[in-house]
């Protein structure tokens, strides 16, 4: 199944968090916090202005992004977890 977000929404896949600390201690699932970092896997066409123009999004597929702890709506597609959020929920893009 292919999922295409509408307007200024994007689909993000969270990055996998380390299960072991630098000191070698394993972190159980119940103690982990969900990461606030992910990779953009799909983007909408853009945000529509009041006069009907479409402004393209700044983020693109493949960008690594940071977002707020409670941003987006969690969805599951074919067994994989994703977040759908608006571009405004993105706090920044991680550049290498």
UniProtKB/Swiss-Prot annotation:
Xref: InterPro entries: Chaperonin_GroES, Chaperonin_GroES_sf, GroES-like_sf
Superkingdom classification of source: Bacteria
GO CC terms, sorted: cytoplasm
GO biological process: chaperone cofactor-dependent protein refolding
Subcellular location: Cytoplasm
UniProt key word Isomerase: no
Pfam families, per database record: Cpn10
Primary location group: cytoplasm
Key words of the record: Chaperone, Cytoplasm
Family to which the UniProt record says this protein belongs: Belongs to the GroES chaperonin family.
Subunit structure: Heptamer of 7 subunits arranged in a ring. Interacts with the chaperonin GroEL.
Function: Together with the chaperonin GroEL, plays an essential role in assisting protein folding. The GroEL-GroES system forms a nano-cage that allows encapsulation of the non-native substrate proteins and provides a physical environment optimized to promote and accelerate protein folding. GroES binds to the apical surface of the GroEL ring, thereby capping the opening of the GroEL channel.
UniProt name for this protein: Co-chaperonin GroES
């Amino acid at each position: 199944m292919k999922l295409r977000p509408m307007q200024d929404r994007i689909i993000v896949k969270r990055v996998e968090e380390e299960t072991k600390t630098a000191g070698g201690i394993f972190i159980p699932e119940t103690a982990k916090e969900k990461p606030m970092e992910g990779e953009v896997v799909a983007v909408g066409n853009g945000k529509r202005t009041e006069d009907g123009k479409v402004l393209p999004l700044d983020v693109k597929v493949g960008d690594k992004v940071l977002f707020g702890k409670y941003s987006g709506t969690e969805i599951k597609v074919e067994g994989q977890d994703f977040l759908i959020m608006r571009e405004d929920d993105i706090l920044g893009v991680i550049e290498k």
